[in-house]
């Protein structure tokens, strides 16, 4: 998947729905290797809906992009970007055996309604994309050299009973 020049030309779409109300749509497309020796592969998805545990949810996107270019018969460059910005509610506290017996395993005591809107005591958000540049060199029939440079930057945080938390640059 990461070497777009090796992918077949074409695309696909897939939609998945869980029994607890989560919908995920995924689209992918690859140009295949074009006449100029380059190729692009992209995959994007979106997930939204309720979580398996009561009072939890997910709102997430994900993306993958790969651009590859054969510079000549011995050298190829690729650029890859991948990431998944997301936000989700969670259950923070473990249930006692008595709570599981009385309310079931999906019970979540960390949420409720406030002014008519769902309020979850614990929410997280996160996005840490990665970007990579790779060079592949076929030195001869027995020797190949691969080199990579990448960067990853991210931001995330969450909320809890003590308020919101997000790291700062200070």
Where are these predicted regions, by residue range?
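N-terminal periplasmic accessory domains that precede
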Residues: 1-14, 25-31
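Flexible, solvent-exposed coil segments and beta strand-coil junctions
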Residues: 2-10, 39-48, 102-116
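Transmembrane beta-barrel wall of Gram-negative outer-membrane proteins
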Residues: 17-48, 53-91, 126, 130-139
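Acidic/polar loop-and-plug regions of large Gram-negative outer-membrane beta-barrel proteins
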Residues: 68, 76-136, 159-170
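Active-site loops and adjacent core secondary-structure elements that bind or stabilize anionic groups
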Residues: 147
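Acidic, polar low-complexity intrinsically disordered regions
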Residues: 151-153
């Amino acid at each position: 998947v990461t070497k777009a020049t090796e992918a077949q030309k074409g695309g696909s779409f897939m939609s998945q729905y869980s029994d607890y109300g989560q919908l995920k749509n995924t689209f992918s497309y690859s140009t295949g290797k074009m006449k100029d020796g380059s190729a692009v592969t992209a995959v994007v998805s979106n997930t939204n809906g309720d979580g398996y545990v009561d009072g939890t949810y997910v709102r997430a996107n994900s993306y993958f992009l790969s651009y590859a270019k054969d510079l000549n018969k011995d050298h190829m460059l690729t650029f890859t970007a991948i990431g998944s910005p997301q936000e989700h509610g969670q259950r923070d506290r473990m249930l006692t055996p008595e709570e599981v017996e009385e309310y079931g395993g999906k019970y979540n005591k960390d949420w409720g309604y406030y002014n008519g809107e769902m309020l979850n005591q614990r929410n997280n958000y996160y996005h840490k994309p990665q970007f990579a540049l790779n060079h592949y060199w076929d030195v001869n029939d027995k020797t190949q050299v691969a080199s990579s440079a990448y960067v990853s930057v991210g931001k995330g945080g969450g909320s809890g009973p003590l308020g919101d938390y997000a790291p700062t640059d200070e």
